[in-house]
Amino acid sequence: MSDKYMKNLTFANIAKACEGRYIGDETLLDTTITGAVIDSRQVKEGYLFIPIKGERVDGHKFIPTVFEQGAAIVLSEHELTDPAGPYVLVESTTDAMKKLAAFYRKSLDIKVVGITGSVGKTSTKEMISSVLEQKYSVHKTAGNFNNEIGLPLTIFGIRESHQAAVLEMGISDFGEMHRLSTMSCPDVMVITNIGYCHLEFLGDRDGVLKAKTECFEHMMPDAVAVLNADDDKLATVQTVNGKPAIYYGKESASDVHKSVYTTNIENLGFDGMKAHFVTPEGEFDAHIHIPGEHNVYNAMAAAAVGLQLGLTIAEIKSGIEKAETIAGRTNFIKTHGMTVIDDCYNANPVSMKSSIEVLSHAKGRTIAVLGDMGELGSDEKKLHHEVGEAVGENHIHTLFAAGELAKEYAAGAAEKSSDVDIHYFEDRETMTQELLSYVKEGDTILVKASHFVEFPKVVEALSE
């Protein structure tokens, strides 16, 4: 079957997988769909349209339109009057979509790598994909399509020609990982770290560990877990489903036995990192062209996954050295004689400190422009204060901070260093105006905050 079609997703199998009732021309039951979407604007000839009930819009109202656009079949939560094509009646289109994604994934002969963790999911996904692409045709999560709506859509993008899929899985509460991993059924499951994310819902890091490791229950029978040995919580996981966990980390950072580890780590500032990698299959030196020590960890995870999926040392090294940044994730923008480090897609304490460390290697004035971090629970002030301390400890020249909790950045920075030029503002707009009059040629400016603070607007202002 060509890549035009979604293998095994006939009308009959769709109805069966969704636990729904097929209503329409019975002679079409063996028809195979060509795609599956929830956005009516993306419907093409032969597609399945899945109408989702949103807060503002109910996708069911677009059913007549999508049939005109060439949709082959739709799902629906209620019986349709004189529909222009067949449909499957289901109790919940959202639940039906998840069931269909799980069915489709299991019907494919493909190796699936799942990735989760408090920090570094997307950058690790990119590194692993870069490595696997040296041997396989790879499908990967686009953008941040990593939740209970995004993951099934990512799975629907897999075609028969793909040999590996790298799927990012993001959660904020208990039970979500159960549902995500039921759909993805990983052959290799990577957990990057257990940090201070979503503590409003998960309580503490032990809660984060419990929620993240729900994925172990839904891995494929011969699956392996690839874990960061230098994370104290993950280091307590000795076996997964009766098999030893595969660990990676720095040679001297912890006592856990590591299958993949690094020595001779060299920070090249904005030119990236160099490290010596030791694996069961051999050793190699690699130049990672993305700044930040955290990218050495991403590369170790990618090496461990590559070995599990049969890549050679040469292929792994090549993939690590070809990896690139993506927009909004430590992206470097040259503008008006300045360098803007656009890292404002999201933020948490660990990623904040990593980005500040990257900034510290810049020449000229270093300016940290920081906004609030969300979902940190009762420790939110303390965790913001610690990020401020990192600004002082890394000898950052200037701090611009905006937001209610960002006061703690200013306090922490002042506590650690009297040399930091500190500017605090209650709102982003006022801060941006002051920042524009402050910056000059030769400055390097880090812009970082949680997504809800809308700091991409700061990057836009600096770039205009």
Language-model regions, residue ranges each:
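ATP-dependent carboxylate/acyl-activation modules
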Residues: 115, 121, 327-329, 452-458
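Active-site beta-alpha connecting loops in nucleotide-dependent enzymes
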Residues: 56, 326, 344, 348-417
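N-terminal leader/targeting and accessory segments in enzymes
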Residues: 1-99, 291, 361, 389-390, ...
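Acidic, Mg2+-coordinating active-site environments of NTP-dependent enzymes
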Residues: 17-18, 76, 80-84, 190-340, ...
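Phosphate-binding loop of NTP-binding sites
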Residues: 12-16, 96-229, 233-243, 306, ...
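Residue-level signal for inorganic ion chemistry
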Residues: 14, 47, 66, 100, ...
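Short acidic-hydrophobic, aromatic-tinged amphipathic segments that line or gate anion-handling sites
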Residues: 88-92, 421-431
